Amino acid sequence: MAEERQDALREFVAVTGAEEDRARFFLESAGWDLQIALASFYEDGGDEDIVTISQATPSSVSRGTAPSDNRVTSFRDLIHDQDEEEEEEEGQRFYAGGSERSGQQIVGPPRKKSPNELVDDLFKGAKEHGAVAVERVTKSPGETSKPRPFAGGGYRLGAAPEEESAYVAGERRRHSGQDVHVVLKLWKTGFSLDNGDLRSYQDPSNAQFLESIRRGEVPAELRRLAHGGQVNLDMEDHRDEDFVKPKGAFKAFTGEGQKLGSTAPQVLNTSSPAQQAENEAKASSSILINEAEPTTNIQIRLADGGRLVQKFNHSHRISDIRLFIVDARPAMAATSFVLMTTFPNKELADENQTLKEANLLNAVIVQRLT
């Protein structure tokens, strides 16, 4: 036993270069375990010159300068590797004043991850929380992402031929929410949802969204879209592609319009044929004709498809034609309309002109609703 302790003492001194009394102190504290004593010596701030420990028998220890075997790892190597890993996560370290062990240490800001590393983290986090990789399938237009289960009623068949079938009502959905299917596309410089705009990875407002994806959770903004329903989220890897906004889907016109060839919408005429004839006769008698002056016949094509022909003096004005139309069709009194010529097609804006001044003698006038 004494000889083994002397060998351990000599090897400790040879490895560390410490004095014999100090070496004996560390060995006695470690129960004469050489490896524990050496570890305690360096943890206590021993000599900075760390010498590689060979795994050979302790009878022949050399302090030569020959290169150590690749299979041997020193305490300094372990500490150095750990420091490198921490620097990658925490940022570069700087020392102000003194040496490495006595100076002030300053840790720089964390190193920003590249888009590739960020996308890898998102996919890795999603898989760790149950996401499954699937092949991309091209859907035909109009195909839904998930078939809807039948929720109606039906008849339960009887157990015997003479037993009547019983009607079974379908169960109503327990919630009023709607299922939402969203495609998350991860691009080179950002991400997009469905056919939306590009959102940058570096934008602080998107940090919470990306962190939720990495933890395998549905982001809050997608849960709000579902209104309590289920959210189906697909992730697509486009990290090697630049973002290109897809063309908007074609939407058919759903408004109202007019049939081609129709000058204006038709006006409903609720008057009976007898009442209409009476109104036209009354309107015609309201136009006072001076037989001593020149006269002309004006043909008027109404917006309701009707046609009127009335005699006027050359001195009558365009406003008189308007009054004649209103008297012949009382329903037109509450309708806004203009009078136009047929060829050339122009609006008769100045209704104070006489028929002769407006060159409307024996003309055809068209009524157009506005």
From Swiss-Prot:
It holds the Pfam family UBA_4. InterPro entries: NSFL1C_SEP_dom_sf (IPR036241), SEP_domain (IPR012989), UBA-like_sf (IPR009060), Ubiquitin-like_domsf (IPR029071), UBX_dom (IPR001012). The keyword Methyltransferase does not apply. It comes from Rattus norvegicus (Rat). Residues 291-368 form the UBX domain. Highly expressed in heart, brain, spleen, lung, liver, muscle, kidney and testis. PANTHER family: NSFL1 COFACTOR P47, UBX DOMAIN CONTAINING PROTEIN. Changing residue 112 to T: Strongly reduces nuclear location. One of its GO terms (cellular component) is chromosome. Residues 54-73, 80-116, 138-157 are annotated as: Disordered. Keywords: Chromosome, Cytoplasm, Cytoskeleton, Golgi apparatus, Lipid-binding, Nucleus, Phosphoprotein. It is found in: Nucleus; Golgi apparatus, Golgi stack; Chromosome; Cytoplasm, Cytoskeleton, Microtubule organizing center, Centrosome. Changing residue 140 to A: Abolishes phosphorylation by CDK1. The gene is Nsfl1c. It comes from the Eukaryota. This is NSFL1 cofactor p47. The modification Phosphoserine is found at residues 74, 102, 114, 140, 176, 192, 272. Belongs to the NSFL1C family.
